[in-house]
């Protein structure tokens, strides 16, 4: 498949200063990440809080400038685009933010918020704006007659639907979803995930999902990339990464899923500081299989199809855990019940979160 988005050795560090304003190091948010996303594919980037996944998502859109490396979209190096060319290219790249309460301007009505990208990119004549806004609201399960209302009049789930409608307004080829359902109630999460699945299928979208919730990821993603302290430690098809994880960190994440049937012990210790990450394999301070080589030598992400950055991936014992969805788990069971037959509300005014 043709790659729509390509990242090569992308690095992003954030400088840290002490109380006197002196340089005191840097946060290693993204360190040498290389990824590709095929046209029409859903890639999930997962990991613990602070691993760099949200920063990576913003770097993909050049909302944050990388320190080094290349980000190519549809064959173009985004770093080489002029401001005007980048502005025009943004029509094809959109983002859905995590917080539905903070991502909408409280001084703009729903119609104004959704129509803004239409005007910025001059996509439809002014006379046709209201019709396009109504069409987008219907597509995300909201009533067009509520277009004149203000964001504070909607629930969290409804606001996130509005944010999705706004992201769709410019007919993008790529959408980044930065934890798009993590702030919502579980039942509302299921509705929004179901909506996203339908949109991805019907509009043939390329979607990058940033998430810490493997239960959500399993229902949406074609491929999964696992991040730890700014680096990709495992990447491959979702069924393989979540069903037969090869990296010790991925195994621990899968084992921590609600309802997982596993003998894998939970991770011990805290995540090391991203200001001073460990040498060699950054996971060695918490890994039960770590050896001296792990402390001294950085493992490379290797493997055709299912890649892993671990010196001992081939010699590790088979993973003991199974995906929670196979064994049960109340939360995932509730999600699955929605996927089996409950479509998003055609009105969209019943969300409670």
Residue ranges and their predicted role:
Residues 169-173:
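A short, proline-enriched helix->beta-strand linker immediately N-terminal to the Walker B motif
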Residues 69-77:
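Conserved ABC transporter NBD signature motif
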Residues 19-24, 78-94, 120, 127, ...:
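ABC ATPase NBD coupling module
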Residues 176, 180-263:
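P-loop NTP-binding/switch modules centered on Walker-like glycine-rich loops
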Residues 3, 16-21, 26, 235-341:
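Short catalytic/signature loops enriched in Gly
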């Amino acid at each position: 498949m043709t790659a729509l988005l390509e990242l090569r050795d992308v690095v992003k560090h954030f400088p840290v200063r002490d109380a006197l304003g002196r340089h005191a190091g840097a946060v290693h948010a993204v360190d040498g990440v290389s990824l590709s996303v095929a046209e029409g594919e859903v890639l999930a980037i997962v990991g613990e809080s602070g691993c760099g996944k949200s920063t990576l998502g913003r770097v993909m859109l050049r909302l944050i400038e990388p320190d080094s490396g290349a980000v190519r979209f549809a064959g173009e190096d985004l770093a080489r685009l002029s401001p005007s060319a980048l502005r025009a290219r943004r029509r094809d790249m959109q983002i859905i933010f995590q917080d539905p309460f903070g991502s909408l301007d409280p001084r703009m009505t729903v119609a104004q918020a959704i129509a803004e990208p239409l005007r910025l990119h001059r996509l439809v004549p002014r006379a046709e704006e209201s019709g396009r806004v109504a069409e987008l609201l219907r597509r995300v399960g909201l009533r067009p007659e509520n277009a004149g209302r203000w964001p504070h009049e909607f629930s969290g789930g409804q606001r996130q639907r509005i944010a999705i409608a706004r992201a769709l307004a410019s007919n993008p080829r790529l959408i980044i979803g930065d934890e798009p359902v993590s702030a919502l109630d579980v039942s509302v999460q299921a509705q929004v995930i179901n909506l996203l699945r339908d949109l991805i299928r019907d509009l043939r979208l390329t979607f990058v999902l940033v998430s810490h919730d493997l239960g959500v990821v399993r229902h949406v993603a074609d491929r999964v990339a696992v991040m730890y302290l700014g680096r990709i430690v495992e990447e491959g098809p979702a069924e393989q990464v979540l069903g037969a994880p090869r990296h010790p960190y991925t195994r621990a994440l899968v084992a921590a899923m609600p309802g997982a049937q596993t003998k894998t012990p939970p991770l011990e210790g805290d995540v090391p500081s991203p200001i001073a990450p460990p040498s060699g394999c950054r996971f060695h301070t918490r890994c039960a299989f770590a050896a001296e080589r792990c402390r001294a030598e950085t493992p490379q992400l290797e493997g055709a199809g299912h890649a892993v950055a671990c010196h001992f991936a081939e010699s590790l014992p088979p993973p003991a855990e199974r995906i929670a969805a196979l064994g049960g788990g109340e939360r995932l069971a509730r999600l699955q019940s929605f996927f089996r037959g409950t479509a998003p509300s055609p009105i969209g005014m019943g969300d409670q979160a």
